[in-house]
Design a protein with these regions (language model features):
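Polybasic/polar functional segments that serve as interface/processing modules
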Residues: 1-132
Length: 132
């Protein structure tokens, strides 16, 4: 169910770290209080990740009740979880699939440092040649 994306219409990732000791009531309250979203919106999966990033929890309201889902990855594996606190993001089916398969869903922009990429004097390639 989780890896295939079957059984729900929308996926909302609750970014940052959440105490995974919470159950259905605690996670539902978290969604209401931190994101002002409705945790009993039918067909919407809310996902949460803890500090270790090797496990996630999800809640989904199915019309007649709420289901609590837990997934723990094998030793050495981690979810690439967005860590921006106080933010909830809706994922496309493709982003969800990438997340469940261990890929990051957010790109990282790194600062460019020109001094690390300067060309060596007298060369076009930027590669220092060994003198004989």
């Amino acid at each position: 169910m989780l890896k295939d994306g079957i059984g729900f219409d929308r996926v909302i990732v609750c970014c940052g770290r959440v105490d995974l000791r919470y159950g259905i009531d605690g996670l539902s309250s978290y969604v209401r209080l931190h994101y002002s979203l409705n945790p009993i919106e039918k067909g919407t999966l809310f996902l949460f990740c803890g500090t270790r990033a090797d496990r996630i929890k999800g809640i989904i309201y199915e019309g007649d009740g709420t289901t609590l889902i837990t997934k723990r990855l094998s030793k050495g594996n981690r979810f690439q979880w967005p860590r921006t606190p106080d933010e909830a993001k809706e994922l496309s089916k493709e982003q969800y699939r990438l997340l469940m398969n261990g890929f990051a869903i957010e790109g990282t922009i790194r600062e460019f440092h020109a001094e690390k990429h300067e060309k060596a004097p007298g060369t076009d390639t930027g590669i220092l040649e060994k003198s004989s």
